């Protein structure tokens, strides 16, 4: 009887942990999609909130950017679409990899770029925030 009770309690704890992590993955995926949408809609308020003040940004050209430099670029963007998202959660840290298709305009004219990216998110005061991001160009 005791063994069955202990097994039942452990099963409930494990199921809760699995569902909890699934919920967190859904929250993180929502942050990633909302961030792409914010770039598309030039929602600087959201971008200021979702990126940590001391975010580490490595561009597809290998440049280190500040949060302010990243947000200044928003006006050039027409759309950002993220796909193939994979999430790994390690406590209050999440690692997201995926593919991004970005279109926009710059001094050279219209562009369309495809990237593989990695975002590192940290859960701060109950909210997921991007603390590091790196992109690698898939265009040859």
Label the predicted regions.
Residues 51, 61, 86-91, 100-102, ...:
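A mature extracytoplasmic/lumenal domain signature
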Residues 4, 8, 15-49:
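Short, low-complexity N-terminal intrinsically disordered segments enriched in polar/charged residues
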Residues 32, 39, 43, 51-55, ...:
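Sec/Tat-exported extracytoplasmic proteins
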Residues 114-139:
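Short beta-strand edge/turn micro-motifs at domain boundaries
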Residues 48-81:
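Short solvent-exposed beta->alpha transition segments
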Residues 35, 47, 55, 70, ...:
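Hydrophobic pocket/interface hotspot
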Residues 71-109:
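Surface-exposed, charged secondary-structure patches
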């Amino acid at each position: 009887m005791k063994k069955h009770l202990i097994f039942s309690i452990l099963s409930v704890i494990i199921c809760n942990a699995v569902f909890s992590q699934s919920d967190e993955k859904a929250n993180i995926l929502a942050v990633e999609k909302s961030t792409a949408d914010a770039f598309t809609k030039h929602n600087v308020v959201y971008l200021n909130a979702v990126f940590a003040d001391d975010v580490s940004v490595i561009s597809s050209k290998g440049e280190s950017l500040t949060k302010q430099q990243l947000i200044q670029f928003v006006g050039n963007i027409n759309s950002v679409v993220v796909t193939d998202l994979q999430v790994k959660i390690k406590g209050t840290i999440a690692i997201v990899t995926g593919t991004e298709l970005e279109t926009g305009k710059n001094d050279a004219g219209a562009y369309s770029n495809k990237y593989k990216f990695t975002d590192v998110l940290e859960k701060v005061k109950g909210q997921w925030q991007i603390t590091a991001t790196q992109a690698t160009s898939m265009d040859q």
